[in-house]
């Protein structure tokens, strides 16, 4: 692309979702400043009729076809059809399959979508991340029952970032804020105390964190949220709830999120 006005349409054809091809094309496009490229994904292409339609559309639009087709018959048909129609193509996965075959003498399975069917961990991770968002900050007490781990503590004890971090370890985490004026959900006392983790913090550390939070929001640091007496009241209340739940407690005063998450993960595995 020699100037900013040239426009290119790229049809991304795949016998699966098409995410792999799209990511590769996006990575390539990012190398061209001022480029005008439109990506159009066409997933789950498994028949020659669809390929013929795409090739003709691409011919009229003077477009490029980038594809990931693992079935040789379908891949060859696309290449032949595109060549006959003078449509440019990029085979993203074919050369890699051929090279691996040459170097290992192993034969591909030629099954579309295997990366998604085999990668169960990927889906568990996505499910856990969605769970953490849905049951963040005590917004739905049903999450307490469904969760692998429940985090409880006062505001600014890293409950949300911990929930997200642990979700990437495929753990479903709900978190519940403890506030003196709000009765904790009854579900908290129905679950095993072993799957509940209390987070405590020193008053001074929490005061510092909340003061910085208020500054970031453009609010006065004298607000009750960062008042040391109020903080002590909240922490005392939280301790009573944790004692009542009889759950293990982690002091997060001087711990990074990663360190605390690893501790929680280890405790969960032991249980």
Swiss-Prot record:
A Pfam family the protein falls into: Kinase-PPPase
Originating species: Shouchella clausii (strain KSM-K16)
Leader sequence segment: none
Domain of life: Bacteria
Keywords, ordered alphabetically: Kinase, Nucleotide-binding, Serine/threonine-protein kinase, Transferase
Keyword Transferase set for record: yes
Family annotation (PANTHER family): PYRUVATE, PHOSPHATE DIKINASE REGULATORY PROTEIN 1, CHLOROPLASTIC (PTHR31756:SF3)
Function: Bifunctional serine/threonine kinase and phosphorylase involved in the regulation of the pyruvate, phosphate dikinase (PPDK) by catalyzing its phosphorylation/dephosphorylation.
Family listed: Belongs to the pyruvate, phosphate/water dikinase regulatory protein family. PDRP subfamily.
InterPro entries: Kinase-pyrophosphorylase, PPDK_reg
HAMAP family, alphabetized: PDRP
Binding site for ADP: 153-160
Keyword Ribonucleoprotein: no
Single GO MF annotation: phosphotransferase activity, phosphate group as acceptor
Catalysed reactions, semicolon-separated: N(tele)-phospho-L-histidyl/L-threonyl-[pyruvate, phosphate dikinase] + ADP = N(tele)-phospho-L-histidyl/O-phospho-L-threonyl-[pyruvate, phosphate dikinase] + AMP + H(+); N(tele)-phospho-L-histidyl/O-phospho-L-threonyl-[pyruvate, phosphate dikinase] + phosphate + H(+) = N(tele)-phospho-L-histidyl/L-threonyl-[pyruvate, phosphate dikinase] + diphosphate
The enzyme's E.C. designation: 2.7.11.32, 2.7.4.27
Protein name (record): Putative pyruvate, phosphate dikinase regulatory protein
